[in-house]
UniProtKB/Swiss-Prot annotation:
Residues 1-255 are annotated as: Mediates interaction with DOC2B. It is found in: Cytoplasm, Cytosol; Cell membrane. One of its GO terms (cellular component) is plasma membrane. This is Syntaxin-binding protein 3. Keywords: Cell membrane, Cytoplasm, Membrane, Phosphoprotein, Protein transport, Transport. Belongs to the STXBP/unc-18/SEC1 family. GO terms for biological process: brain development; cellular response to type II interferon; insulin secretion; intracellular glucose homeostasis; intracellular protein transport; negative regulation of calcium ion-dependent exocytosis; negative regulation of D-glucose import; neutrophil degranulation. The lineage of its organism: Eukaryota, Metazoa, Chordata, Craniata, Vertebrata. It comes from Homo sapiens (Human). Together with STX4 and VAMP2, may play a role in insulin-dependent movement of GLUT4 and in docking/fusion of intracellular GLUT4-containing vesicles with the cell surface in adipocytes. Megakaryocytes and platelets.
Length: 592
């Protein structure tokens, strides 16, 4: 059984830090407070705790700082907010004058560094009402136990749009992301060696240099930290174009498949059972979800009915009856039994919904996609004519435009770019002129679509001996990278360090005398060395899965993967389509 979320990885680390730096800092026995959150801190707290946890910390009400609220002048307020003008102005409005103060006093905790102009604004306006004003350095969302996101929705556009007018916006986004990544490292108590993928774009290089400088500054200032030199961890920064295939391929592992094929929003799955509409949240508190989310759909469909039978046999052993009334009685006596059944019903529905979509259209696509992605068929024979593999998909009227675009992209990726003439012909024949930018704009990510010169394809690790399903032969590039990083096999020209490489990662035994003392290299790895990965512009659920798989295989090193956001193929193609549009038009379309 999976441990509860309170004991689970990154979420637990973040919650413990918030408890220590926020709640323990302002807690008084028997005193209740109102808590004010902005959009980001609402997501942050929701990702790592429940309302019951907040009640235990003396919080009686949680409110949105942006909304109009009734004054509660007899109570103190705890503000957990981002250091932005909008959030600070809302706080100042609450304490506009002594006679109009909304609350008795304020405890302010910023997620990260508060700029001097905002700090001085607070100091000048209402310093007498403030009991605390601190920065806690947690400016990311722990999405899963080994996954973090920065929640920077504009990052993809600013980092990859070709519009030179976006240069200032891009610089600002880069600074923000660097600050946030530093808080990830600080929360994990790490000062990693920073490396980046050197080609084809310079985003990763720029961001890595910023992060390196900010890490240096952070550990100079943070007197409480024992870490001054580099620790035994690595941080890899990568541009999204490093692996376009994994972003558009149909994945058949459970979580990736469900988020691709079904309308799951905010991790909420809607389904029907007994003629009633129901909702379920796909979260790590659900031990069954944790157990099966990275398994192939074929395995999931075998496993859930087996679990149903196990519970059924438990019921029979307990009651000796199989009637509905006996089952009802048992559920009353054993609430955990009802909870187990509910979970299994949810996941069986989810798996069946995935399979219905798969059988309808996706099954025929998958063989084509795998052959194009790998350049070989299921028997290991080389694909000689990629166009011949693609054509049946384009001629099939049952496939929608989005699936055809995904197949065309895989075809182009497989041959490392095509000619303008060939691309025009494909677009016209499939009648996707209005969506053609979903294909062409990949070039802004450094992916060869209509290349000026022939580029070599990166070499892949030989995985032919690994056991796979025929329609799931592709392995995301990021798994190769993670494994090579842990085994110290990354090419230093392709993956330069921003500063001197930590000794333990370059095979040397020397360790900085200033760094946090640890027993020895092997002991350190055993106690949890970290490989932290950051992808600029989104990660896929298949890449998320790789972080868990590699951690499981290399128990001496935990892989933590993160990005600006977690993407699905459809959302990514929509974002790519907008890259050559003006920023105001992009915002307008998204608002609609």
């Amino acid at each position: 059984m999976a441990p509860p979320v309170a004991e689970r990885g990154l979420k637990s680390v973040v919650w413990q830090k918030i408890k220590a730096t926020v709640f323990d800092d302002c807690k008084k026995e028997g005193e209740w407070k109102i808590m004010l959150l902005d959009e980001f801190t609402t997501k942050l707290l929701a990702s790592c705790c429940k309302m019951t946890d907040l009640l235990e910390e003396g919080i009686t009400v949680v409110e949105n700082i942006y909304k109009n609220r009734e004054p509660v002048r007899q109570m103190k307020a705890l503000y957990f907010i981002t250091p932005t003008s909008k959030s600070v102005d809302c706080f100042l409005h609450d304490f506009a004058s002594k006679s109009e103060n909304k609350y008795k006093a304020a405890y302010i905790y910023f997620t990260d560094f508060c700029p001097d102009n905002l700090f001085n604004k607070i100091k000048a306006s209402c310093s007498k009402s403030i009991r605390r004003c601190k920065e806690i350095n947690i400016s990311f969302i722990p999405h899963e136990s080994q996954v973090y996101t920065l929640d920077v929705p504009d990052a993809f556009y600013y980092c990859y749009s070709p519009d030179p007018g976006n240069a200032k916006g891009k610089d600002a986004i880069m600074e923000t992301m660097a600050d946030q990544i530093v808080t990830v490292c600080a929360t994990l108590d790490e000062n990693p060696g920073v490396r980046y993928k050197s080609k084809p774009l310079d985003n990763a290089s720029k961001l890595a240099q910023l992060v390196e400088k900010k890490l240096e500054d952070y550990y100079k200032i943070d007197e409480k930290s024992l870490i001054k030199g580099k620790t035994h961890s690595q941080l890899l920064i990568i541009d999204r174009g490093f692996d376009p295939v994994s972003t558009v391929l149909h994945e058949l592992t459970f979580q990736a498949m469900a988020y691709d094929l079904l309308p799951i929003e905010n991790d909420t799955y809607k389904y029907k059972t007994d003629g009633k509409e129901k909702e379920a949240i796909l979260e790590e508190e659900d031990d069954l979800w944790v157990r099966i989310r990275h398994r192939h759909i074929a395995v999931v469909l075998e496993e859930i009915p087996k679990l149903m039978k196990e519970i059924s046999s438990t019921k029979k052993a307990t009651e000796g009856k199989t009637s509905l009334s006996a089952l009802t009685q048992l559920m009353k006596k054993m609430p955990h039994f009802r909870k187990q059944i509910t979970k299994q019903v949810v996941h069986l529905n989810l798996a069946e919904d995935c399979m219905n979509k798969f059988k309808l259209n996706i099954e025929k696509l998958c063989k084509t996609e795998q052959d194009l992605a790998l350049g070989t068929d299921a028997e290991g024979q080389k694909v000689k004519d990629s166009m011949r593999v693609l054509l049946p998909v384009l001629l099939n009227k049952n496939h929608d435009n989005c699936d055809k675009i995904r197949a065309i992209l895989l075809y182009i990726f497989s041959i490392n770019g095509t000619t303008e003439e060939n691309l025009d012909r494909l677009i016209q024949n499939v009648k996707i002129e209005n969506e053609s930018d979903m294909i062409r704009n990949w070039s802004y990510l450094g992916v060869p679509i209509v290349p000026q010169s022939q580029q070599g394809k990166p070499l892949r690790k030989d995985r032919s001996a690994e056991e796979t399903f025929q329609l799931s032969r592709w392995t995301p590039f990021i798994k190769d990278i993670m494994e090579d990083a842990i085994d110290n096999r990354l090419d230093s020209k392709e993956w330069p360090y921003c500063s001197q490489c930590p000794a333990v990662w370059n095979g040397s035994g020397a360790v900085s005398a200033r760094q946090k003392p640890r027993a020895n290299y092997l002991e350190d790895r055993k106690n949890g060395s970290k490989l932290i990965v950051f992808v600029i512009g989104g990660i896929t659920y298949s890449e998320v899965r790789c972080a868990y798989e590699v951690s499981q295989a290399h128990k001496s090193c935990e892989v933590i993967i993160g990005s600006t956001h977690v993407l699905t193929p459809k959302k990514l193609l929509d974002d790519i389509k907008m890259l050559n549009k003006p920023k105001d038009k992009v915002s307008l379309i998204k608002d609609e």
